[in-house]
């Protein structure tokens, strides 16, 4: 997947799931399943329910995404 093909949206973490997966509610009200990107995992950035995050979505499957940024409160 090329970097230009991704869709970036903001959302709020609703629930924490096993294996660094999260349920994220997007701005438009849709709920998706998202995993943590490698850089966030590498720098031990903790993501908790209620955090605002940026999610990258693939145009091929809009129900799964990758968390690329956690906003500072």
Curated annotation (Swiss-Prot):
Family, per entry: Belongs to the IF-1 family.
Reported function: One of the essential components for the initiation of protein synthesis. Stabilizes the binding of IF-2 and IF-3 on the 30S subunit to which N-formylmethionyl-tRNA(fMet) subsequently binds. Helps modulate mRNA selection, yielding the 30S pre-initiation complex (PIC). Upon addition of the 50S ribosomal subunit IF-1, IF-2 and IF-3 are released leaving the mature 70S translation initiation complex.
Span of domain S1-like: 1-72
UniProt-listed Gene3D superfamilies: Nucleic acid-binding proteins (2.40.50.140)
UniProt keyword Cytoplasm present: yes
Gene Ontology cellular-component terms listed: cytosol
Keyword Cell membrane (UniProt): no
Location in or out of the cell: Cytoplasm
Quaternary structure, from the entry: Component of the 30S ribosomal translation pre-initiation complex which assembles on the 30S ribosome in the order IF-2 and IF-3, IF-1 and N-formylmethionyl-tRNA(fMet); mRNA recruitment can occur at any time during PIC assembly.
Organism whose genome encodes this protein: Lactobacillus johnsonii (strain CNCM I-12250 / La1 / NCC 533)
UniProt name for this protein: Translation initiation factor IF-1
Highest taxon in the source lineage: Bacteria
Gene name for this UniProt entry: infA
Predominant cellular place of this UniProt entry's protein: cytoplasm
Pfam families: eIF-1a
Keyword terms of this UniProt record: Cytoplasm, Initiation factor, Protein biosynthesis, RNA-binding, rRNA-binding
GO MF, one example: rRNA binding
HAMAP family for this protein: IF_1
InterPro entries cross-referenced by the UniProt entry: NA-bd_OB-fold (IPR012340), RNA-binding_domain_S1_IF1 (IPR006196), S1_domain (IPR003029), TIF_IF1 (IPR004368)
């Amino acid at each position: 997947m090329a970097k230009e093909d991704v869709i970036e949206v903001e959302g709020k973490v609703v629930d924490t799931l096993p294996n660094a997966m999260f349920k994220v509610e997007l701005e438009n009200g849709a709920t998706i399943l998202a995993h943590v990107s490698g850089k966030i995992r590498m720098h031990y950035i903790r993501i908790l329910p209620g955090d605002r995050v940026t999610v990258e979505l693939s145009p091929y499957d809009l129900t799964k995404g990758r968390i690329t940024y956690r906003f500072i409160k």
